[in-house]
Amino acid sequence: MVEYAWPEALRPSRLTFYLQHNTTRFVSPVTRATQVLRREGARWVAEASFDPLSPARAGLLEGLLAALAGSLNTVRIWDWRREFRTGDPRVQGDVPSGPFSYSDATIFTDGTGFVVGSGNPALAAGAPRGALAIQTGGWWPNGVAVGAGDLIGLAGRLYIATEKVTASGAGTATIPIAPPLREALLINQPLVLTKPTVAMRLVSDDEAANPTRPGRFTAITIRLEEAL
């Protein structure tokens, strides 16, 4: 299997991009009481339409689709609607690195102290597989770390923040996410916050269908699903 990068020159004119959950629903035939079981296998699903495509851009897309060989290979795409997070664009790496603290870590009598820049956002603690929240650090103190719906890349996988989260004065934030964490991750794993990507494969072998109208403009719609 080969993984391809998505060409920057190709942006969809219409897009569907969402997290498809995997649940089982049981309904009592007597009382209609319902039980729902969450199962593993939630995945990102996308449908992207490119219309119109000039001959050059149509060729670029058709070449990529041919290389993907149906569902065999994968391509890394992102949600074109949400390429950047809505939180405070500053991070602790923007804070001058000092010297701003005492060598013995002394704080003031009112409990305040200095904030020292600590780089870009990353995991502040390890997280187990299946976790629904991650502990992070490196945010701008007391700023909005992420907004609800912001996308986060972690270890090559894509997650969505389910709530708006404000960082603490120390620049830490616990962020609720979906889907559950795909794998256990170690402390200091960096967060991708700009165009976080997900590896996807074509749903079928017919995704390269390319109806063309007079004027040599081509329209192509592709369906993709996350490679789990």
Where does each model-flagged region fall?
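Extracellular/virion structural assembly segments
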Residues: 1-228
